[in-house]
Amino acid sequence: MRHNKKFNHLGRTNTHRDAMLSNMACSLIKHKRIFTTTAKAKALRKYVEPLITKSKEDTTHSRRVVFSNLQDKFAVTELFKEIAQKIGDRPGGYTRIIKTGNRLGDNAAMCFIELVDYNENMLKDTAAKKAPKTRRSRKKATASVAEAPTAEAASEEKAAE
């Protein structure tokens, strides 16, 4: 039976895959965005998101656990100091995959994988979208309330005549 065998091996041995994901995670933490194939990005997302969750709690144990996966002092300090503070209130979903099309040589699906809170363009768009948003139902309710007194006043004038 194939229970619990759903895992993309990426055509590599276990040690090669672990080393590749570790290097890609360090690059993602340092540069905040990397360009890679979609399959590698999806594997990297499953690898790096638990590490980012661990970095929210800055203890010696969590630093050692993360360092055992990354093996890069600069990436670990960047993760625990800068990134953990910026995503402290986010409950998950720290990465975003943006598909960019296929590679010319072998037609492999390519994409960007980036940390969500570090894309300035999307942060500006969400801030701009949130400001002018109003609710229609309240405007209709106030408009109907404003019309009601005028109708009552008109009926009172007719009764007075």
From Swiss-Prot:
Disulfide bonds: none annotated. Residues 142-153 have a biased composition (Low complexity). Part of the 50S ribosomal subunit. Contacts protein L32. GO terms for biological process: translation. It comes from Parabacteroides distasonis (strain ATCC 8503 / DSM 20701 / CIP 104284 / JCM 5825 / NCTC 11152). Residues 130-141 have a biased composition (Basic residues). Belongs to the bacterial ribosomal protein bL17 family. One of its GO terms (molecular function) is structural constituent of ribosome. PANTHER family: LARGE RIBOSOMAL SUBUNIT PROTEIN BL17M, RIBOSOMAL PROTEIN L17. PROSITE patterns: RIBOSOMAL_L17. This is Large ribosomal subunit protein bL17. Keywords: Ribonucleoprotein, Ribosomal protein. InterPro entries: Ribosomal_bL17, Ribosomal_bL17_CS, Ribosomal_bL17_sf. Residues 126-161 are annotated as: Disordered. GO terms for cellular component: cytosolic large ribosomal subunit.
